[in-house]
């Protein structure tokens, strides 16, 4: 068994999906804030870590795995949840990447925008989200199961769930127009 430490900031953004996957797979891990793990200010730490960004997953106090989707794929593999069929794995990766692309419009608005700035960003983002959610709903319907690639969740499911869930901070009713995605989040 590997020692796992997920390092991030105190915000809801890129560490939720890995934590959901690790909890689901009953993996032991520590979740640490950057300043606690590195014992230094972010500006001092940033140049020393891969790609100068978080989250990172520390494996066995030796290896640093950067980039959210790489972390998700590693954890999925470690938990034995990776699809064995290469075509299914590629389709799952496409869904994972598509979900991750939702981070850019959602995160700055949900976590940092307030007042009129929030309302303005929300209104300009909803048409794009509607199109992206329609794509995800179609993929979920084409999967024909409870989850995107079958009857058990894998990395893409946790990532999609996280982004759909935080989108409800924009408009609690927005997701209702996508009945299958709403069911996915509810279940």
Predicted regions and their residues:
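GST-like domain detector, emphasizing the conserved glutathione-binding G-site
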Residues: 1-133, 142, 148
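GST superfamily/GST-like fold recognition
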Residues: 92, 147-182, 186
